[in-house]
Amino acid sequence: AKGHGLIMVMGKGGVGKTTIAAALAVGLVQRGHSVHLTTTDPAAHVQSQLDGSLPGLKVGRIDPRAETQAYIDKIMATRGKALDDAGRALLLEDLQSPCTEEVAVFHAFSRVVNEARTAFVVLDTAPTGHSLLLMDATGAYHRQMTQHYQGSAGGAMAKHIITPLMRLQDADMTHVVIVTLPEVTPVSQAAALQEDLRRAHIEPWAWVINKSVAATGTSDPLLQARLAGEQKQCERIAQGLAQRTFVLPWLTEPPVGVEALGGLVTADGLLSH
C-alpha cells in the first residue's frame, strides 16, 4: 500500500459492512498505517465493534444532524452577517429545507475524500439507497463545477479542478468494496449497486461475500441445500460480477475487538492485495 487512499465499504443494510470496514481499518493500522475510520450510517456502531482504542486509528462519524447544524451556523455567520433581522429570518427559513442536510453531508463527505490524499480513510457507508443519494450529490457538484469553470477564462481552469467524484473514479486513490451475503436477493441487490456505480464511472475493486457457511468447512448433511445455494451464488459473483472476490465464513459470534477484527482480514487475505 502507498500509505494513503480511500476505501469505501458499500452494500445493503445487514450484510456486515461495519464489521468489514472496522476489520480493514484495524488491519491497515497493524501494518503501520495511520487510519481514519468513519461512517455515514446513522445506525452504525463502529466504536462498539472495535471495543477499545488502537494507536494510529481515529474513529469518527458523519452525523447528518450535527453536520446540518454546523453548516447552518456557518452560513448564518457569513452570508447572514450583513443582513438585517428580517433578512436573517428569511435566510434561516431557507436553510430549513431538506436540501440543506444533503448539502451539509456532501460537504462532510468531501472533506473525508480529501483527507484520503494524505492518509488512509475507511468509510463505512449507509445502506445502498442513502449512499446512492450521496453519489447523486457528488455527481451534481462535479457537473456544476466543470460547467462553471468551462465557462470562465476560456475553460482553462476546468483542466485543473479535481472534484470528489474524480477522486472516487480514480482507481489508484479509491477502492470500493461491495459487501454481500451468499444469497440470491443480496447478490442481485449488490449487482444493481455495482451497475449504479459503473454508470458514475466508479469501478468496484472487490466484493466480500460475508457469512458463508461453506467457508466454515462444514459437511453437515442438514446444510447441503444451503451449501449448494451458496455455491451457485459464489460462482455467479466470481464468473460475471466481481473483479476480485473474498469470502468470509459464518461465525457463531460476531467479531468484536481489535484482535478478532484484525484476524478477519488476515485470514481472508483482503489486505494482501
Regions found by a protein language model. Give the residues of each.
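Conserved catalytic network of the ASCE P-loop NTPase/AAA+ motor domain
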Residues: 28-31, 52-54, 113-116, 168-172, ...
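Generic enzyme active-site microenvironment
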Residues: 39, 122, 208
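A conserved catalytic-core segment of Leloir-type glycosyltransferases
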Residues: 55-85
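Phosphate/Mg2+-binding loops and adjacent switch elements
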Residues: 81-184, 189-192
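Walker A/P-loop NTP-binding active-site region of P-loop NTPases
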Residues: 8-67, 125, 134-142
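Switch/connector loops and helix/strand junctions flanking conserved nucleotide-binding motifs
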Residues: 45-48, 67-70, 129-134, 187-188, ...
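Pre-Walker A (Motif I) flank of P-loop NTPase domains
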Residues: 2-7
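C-terminal lobe/tail of nucleotide-utilizing enzymes
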Residues: 1, 169-173, 181-273
